[in-house]
Amino acid sequence: MSRYTVFMCVLGALGASVCDASALTLDEAYASVSLSPPTTRMVIVCHDFGCAQRTPVGLGAGDHATLSSLLAPGRASAEAERKAVAAAAAWFDRRVGPEAGTTRRVARATGLGGQSTVGQMDCIDTSRNSTSLLLILEQLHLLRHHKVEGPEARGFVLDGRGPHATAVLTDIHTGKQWAVDSWTHKYGERPDVIPLDVWKQQS
């Protein structure tokens, strides 16, 4: 099994999330936070920062049909598939939000300045949830041009940038990696899907 970078968050004294990265297998990554990997029938949604709260959401035939419809335009090319993935991610956020209590999720939630973490998501939550969605798409055989990778991180205190994590896809034709980052957008909006090397240079 391939190695990947997994991120765990703890709440700091000021309420900000502090991210630590370590190389783990996919199984180890989910086990490290006592989280079951997604299946086509069930996904556990992380929220309230650092996956402090987990809400199981059942998925059925109707959900599978919706995802299939959303990914259908992506069959044409890798670029089209990335656009379709973004549309699926926005739908997924709206699908699980009412059950997880995250319908008022804001963009770039930090927990600083007294900001409540209830119903919000930090980058650990969004990167893990996005990775779970991507794995579901893979399990449903809806990804033709990409494979799912583990989350990647950028930034740490010493380089002056706050830690941040994102879900990742690899274009199977070119090997180019792409960030799928929903933390930068509020509830129900499409995530950024940009080259991972570009994402890593951002702050």
Regions found by a protein language model. Give the residues of each.
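Hydrophobic/aromatic-rich core segments of domains that either
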Residues: 135-199
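Boundary at the C-terminal end of the N-terminal hydrophobic targeting segment
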Residues: 21-23
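Bacterial N-terminal signal peptides
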Residues: 7-17
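Acidic/histidine-rich, surface-exposed loop or edge segments in extracytoplasmic proteins
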Residues: 47-79, 105-116
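Mid-length scaffold segments of soluble, non-membrane domains
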Residues: 81-146
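Positively charged n-region of N-terminal signal peptides that target proteins for export
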Residues: 1-4
